[in-house]
UniProtKB/Swiss-Prot annotation:
Name of the featured protein: Phosphoenolpyruvate carboxykinase [GTP]
Reactions that this protein is recorded to catalyse: oxaloacetate + GTP = phosphoenolpyruvate + GDP + CO2
Residues engaged in binding GTP: 272-277, 388, 419, 514-517
Gene from which the chain derives: pckG
Chain positions recorded as Mn(2+) binding sites: 229, 249, 296
Species whose genome carries this gene: Mycolicibacterium smegmatis (strain ATCC 700084 / mc(2)155) (Mycobacterium smegmatis)
Source taxonomy: Bacteria, Bacillati, Actinomycetota, Actinomycetes, Mycobacteriales
């Protein structure tokens, strides 16, 4: 078909010539049966969900258990982000840096153009306009995703401000990030579709300099919902570097003291380290309350008053299901219970509800994530470890009224944290901004199921951004340092380093975590207010057990002491690992971080 004969191309609801030319170019290349501009309406959502049920992609769940909610089971080969197939294609290889896969942009465009040729035959090409962050922001960040996946269209409606309003905001000549996605599964006439079409060949490619994303072969989450990690972190981090702001893999939490004073906290943890749990914290200490601004991504820029303000660019939660339950995260469960959720790769109960490992209940029979019968004797997990729920943020019972404020919220503290059995104390305060950047830059965490790789080994994950950097990691560290240098130091957030996951010699968790983490945050807030003590150690300022509010907490004081312990011999063992990491970062490592490393070595040597 030529573009003139592809239905829908001639009835586009926009006069934006750049957008129309791009849609026409992609349609001519990919050869869809029709072109549809998504409007983001309820009616469209219901129509697409009904289509997905008919196609076998969605199963409608019991409306009494999960109102207006669906279950999708993916192809077993398409279950997580594929870091090995994720590329940053800058003109110069050094600008992508050592943490990213790189290919020459012209070569990559050639390879992927061949893959896209005819890839949407037999399918519909959807044009999905969206905005990351509030539509009424001073500088709204707009994007358009072209996709042949209805699963993507309905998920983008939940995860972003998608549809007619975003298209109107774009106007006739506004800038937008081009995000092209195809599952790579063309249908010949009469060919029967499969419930989860995808392609064995996968590419998730970013062109930071031209602000473009090309994704092929995967229908799963972060590979296909291109507003999420691809735009909000990889492309946005490059934009932020050029424009003087920060795009970070961080939750945003509002903590309210008994005196009704609000503190906004941003926290960077690698995937599956409790970001969503902390974002929806239920404090266990009397008089303290918490509200949610975001659970995954924070865009931070300086306000007119010199403080750092953060916005959550997302519109929904795309959370890991396993481990989420009524005790670990009751607010996530309430958000899900309100309905309007798409579950992916969880198990299904006999009465049309969902189940996953860690959820209350003791089911004797399920249909597992592969569509097979499951019983407790099956010997494998019923839900995939990276199974997900995709749910509107507006349903969260702890949602802060400021979540949608185009100005953002002023950040008082930044936390970095990972999953470490040893070495790293429950909380450490950085000495200053540059020391805080060093802490973030050397963050280590044990591998999780959210990405490919061996589970349990410690990998460096700087600022929890290792898989999400859109440019050279050394330039990124320098950007963080410069953000601090260019600011009024008295107005910068304090930086803390947390580890909820430290274990004793017998393998037990030393700290109960979850809602009890409010006690740790209380100490951080009191440090901001100069009301709490801490002990200077080689790695920073660490509280003693007496400095924490442990009232009403049933925990052995010796365990708290152990959770807070700074053991010089463990840190000396950490030094060569940090050195190895900095060598990997290479020539662009800022001297400020080398200075911090030398200072840490010196302080540890003085400990004897």
């Amino acid at each position: 078909m030529t573009s003139a004969t592809i239905p829908g191309l001639d009835t586009a609801p926009t006069k934006h010539q750049g957008l129309l030319a791009w849609v026409q170019e992609v349609a001519e290349l990919t050869q869809p049966d029709r072109v549809v501009f998504a409007d983001g309406s309820d009616e469209e959502y219901e129509r697409l969900c009904a289509h997905l049920v008919e196609a076998g992609t969605f199963q409608k769940l019991n409306p009494e258990k999960q109102p207006n909610s669906y279950l999708a089971l993916s192809d077993p080969s398409d279950v997580a982000r594929v870091e090995s197939r994720t590329f940053i294609c800058t003109e110069r290889e050094i600008d992508a840096g050592p943490t990213n896969n790189w290919m020459d942009p012209a070569e990559m465009r050639g390879i992927m153009t061949d893959l896209y040729r005819g890839s949407m035959r037999g399918r519909t090409l959807y044009v999905v306009p969206f905005c990351m962050g509030p539509l009424d922001a001073e500088d709204p960040k707009l994007g358009v995703e072209i996709t042949d996946s209805e699963y993507v269209v309905v998920s983008m409606r939940t995860m972003t401000r998608m549809g007619r309003a975003a298209l109107d905001k774009l106007g006739d000549d506004g800038f937008f990030v081009k995000a092209l996605h195809s599952i790579g599964a063309p249908l010949e006439p009469g060919q029967k579709d499969v419930p989860w079409p995808c392609n064995d060949t996968k590419y998730i490619t970013h062109f930071p300099e031209t602000r473009e994303i090309w994704s092929f072969g995967s229908g799963y989450g972060g590979n296909a919902l291109l507003g999420k990690k691809c735009y909000s972190l990889r492309i946005a981090s490059a934009m932020a570097h050029d424009e003087g702001w920060l795009a970070e893999h961080m939750l945003i939490l509002k903590l309210i003291s008994p005196e009704n004073k609000a503190y906004f906290i941003a926290a960077a943890f690698p995937s599956a380290c409790g970001k969503t749990n902390l974002a929806m914290l239920q404090p266990t200490i009397e008089g303290w309350r918490a509200e949610t601004v975001g659970d995954d991504i924070a865009w931070m820029r300086f306000g007119k008053d010199g403080r750092l303000y953060a916005t959550n660019p997302e519109f929904g939660f795309f959370g890991v299901a396993p481990g989420t339950n009524w005790s670990s995260n009751p607010n996530a469960m309430k958000t899900i219970a309100a309905g309007n959720t798409v579950f992916t790769n969880v198990a299904k109960t006999d009465d049309g509800d969902v189940w996953w490992e860690g959820l209350e209940g003791d089911p004797q029979h399920l249909i597992d994530w592969k569509g097979n019968d499951w019983t407790p004797e099956s010997g494998e997990k019923a839900a995939h470890p990276n199974s997900r729920y995709c749910t509107p943020i507006s349903q969260c019972p702890t949602l802060a009224p400021e979540w949608d404020d185009p100005q953002g919220v002023p950040i008082s503290a930044i936390l970095f944290g990972g999953r470490r059995k040893t070495t790293v104390p429950l909380i450490t305060e950085a000495r200053d901004w540059q020391h805080g950047v060093f802490i973030g830059a050397t963050l280590g965490s044990e591998q999780t199921a959210a990405a490919e790789g061996k589970v349990g080994t410690v990998r460096r994950d700087p600022m929890a951004m290792l898989p999400f950097l859109g440019y050279n990691v050394g330039d990124y560290f320098a950007h963080w340092i410069n953000v601090g240098k260019n600011a009024d130091e008295s107005k910068l957030p304090k930086v803390f380093f947390v580890n909820w996951f430290r274990r004793g010699d017998d393998g037990r968790f030393l700290w109960p975590g979850f809602g009890e983490n409010s006690r740790v945050l209380k100490w951080a807030v009191e440090r901001i207010e100069h009301k709490a003590d801490g002990k200077s150690t080689p790695i920073g300022i660490v509280p003693t057990a007496a400095d924490l509010d442990l009232e009403g907490l049933d925990v052995d004081p010796a365990d708290v002491d152990e959770a807070l312990a700074v053991k010089p011999e463990e840190w000396r063992a950490e030094l060569p690992l940090i050195e190895e990491w900095f060598e990997f970062v290479g020539e662009k490592l800022p001297t400020g971080l080398k200075d911090e490393f030398d200072a840490l070595k010196h302080r540890l040597s003085e400990e004897g």
